[in-house]
């Protein structure tokens, strides 16, 4: 997934589709995996992935490096704060934040 400079974002959410799919498969819990492919401070300056725990926003990308795999519960509230929202958006840019994600989904 690409979150481009100029405001690429993902609103805070829980992975409802993964939660529903896990229930259909009679799983109580499912974990998502996310591979970080860019580095905050190098590939983009502001924004990035976060989780919300105990009503506090945690910027996990302050601590993470390129190649790190994050594993989190599908029920965790998470998202992406605007990537370099001080820059004018350019939908053709390849610059910004990149991740690869694996989730559970079943029709």
Predicted segments, located by residue:
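Conserved double-stranded beta-helix
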Residues: 1-41, 101
